[in-house]
Amino acid sequence: NLDAAGISVGEALDAHALRFADLPQREKIATHAFVELHIEQGPVLAQANVPLGVVSGIQGVRWYQVSCKGASAHAGTTPTHMRRDALLLAMESLGRIDALAERLAGDDKRLTFGRWNVSPNAINTIAGEATFSIDFRHADPAVLDAFDNALSACLPADAELTSLFSHSPTAFDHQVINLLENACEATGLTWQSIRSGAFHDAMYLAGHCPTAMLFVPSRDGISHNPKEFTDPAQLKAGAQALAWSLVALAEQP
């Protein structure tokens, strides 16, 4: 798994550790539990008018990069039937990829083509190469695997498919989930079970200790945007449920 600069997570961590090699490290001790409070970053709670969400887990994800090859040529002198436009080849594959995701995931489809690069990116030149990313998420590892196995058949024959990142679905601890449900009940407010589609610290902590999460609504489902907003009363409700749950965890033997 490499980033846009071709650097792996391991390489980045090694470089980071070298910069701070002299910092003291805390003693490694067992962690009793981890609870994370976060905005939903989606519209589900807000549309349901529910102030609190107890998160059951986090969807798994597959990231890919697809590079479609064409032939750069003059935009005004090359007849249509003699062109090999890489961008058109890429766009034709989008419908097939979307149909695959729809068939496998139905209403739970989470498919995004978020990053594009077209070369030579000139107004008077046919695209010789078009590169785009695929972000596919689902809670069922079998669906993720099926998408992975069938994806290449959706692409042009000479397209280059690269896997960028993969993470299995995360299931949170049932006992911590039950404790958070009790915490929400203690606030006197309505709540519902919800699954996270975004990555959170809890996704990584779940492999080390019992873990779960609380969500509060995001107005209009907007996140990663200056318009991101959660009502202060809902923030208060989330903080109250978090405090209740932490006290309950602290009192456990």
Positions of PLM-derived features:
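Short amphipathic alpha-helices in soluble, non-transmembrane regions
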Residues: 146-155
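Short secondary-structure junctions
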Residues: 103-111, 156-159, 184-190
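Midchain, well-structured core segments that form catalytic/ion-binding scaffolds
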Residues: 1-142
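Short, low-order "capping/linker" segments at domain edges
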Residues: 169-187, 212
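Zn-dependent metallopeptidase/amidohydrolase metal-coordination segment
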Residues: 191-244, 249
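Predominant activation on well-ordered alpha-helical scaffold segments within soluble catalytic domains
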Residues: 10, 14, 65, 87-98, ...
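Short beta-alpha connecting loops at secondary-structure transitions
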Residues: 137-141, 164-168, 221-232
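A short beta-alpha structural unit
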Residues: 112-121, 132-139, 159-177, 203
